[in-house]
């Protein structure tokens, strides 16, 4: 994306596997929230940039490739026991409850945080 043009589609946030942030914008943003140990910090950082009035644009060209994490190796795998899924969910690569609630509350507000914090547990209990 060319910084001085409106090239690219606007979006709400980003995954920081490949993101370019102009220096003057970087200097005006806080660092990634220390509440996050692994995931969600980059998405939260993008939302913070938008809240400060910056636009996020998706490049019209490929600038990199990142392989998705397969469901088979995550807490979402319904073939794992409930105990294993819960353990994986609470790991840094899952959705640790405090971090997940913090992310939701900060970016979507309290009601959404309460409801969506419970959904992973219901999915585990119901084997979904």
Report each predicted region and the residues it spans:
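Active-site donor/metal-binding and catalytic loop motifs
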Residues: 52-82
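A recurrent flexible, glycine/aromatic-enriched loop bordering the glycosyltransferase active site
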Residues: 2-21, 85-89
């Amino acid at each position: 994306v060319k910084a001085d043009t409106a090239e690219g589609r606007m979006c709400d946030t980003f995954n920081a596997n490949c993101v370019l942030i102009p220096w003057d914008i970087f200097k005006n943003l806080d660092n990634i929230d220390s509440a996050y140990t692994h995931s969600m910090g980059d998405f939260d950082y993008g939302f913070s940039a938008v809240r400060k009035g910056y636009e996020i644009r998706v490049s019209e060209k490929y600038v990199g490739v990142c392989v998705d994490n397969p469901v088979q190796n995550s807490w979402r795998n319904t073939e794992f026991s409930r105990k294993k899924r819960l353990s994986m969910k609470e790991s840094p690569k899952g959705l640790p409850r405090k971090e997940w609630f913090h992310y939701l509350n900060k970016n979507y507000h309290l009601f959404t945080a309460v409801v969506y914090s419970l959904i992973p547990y219901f999915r585990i209990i119901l084997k979904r």
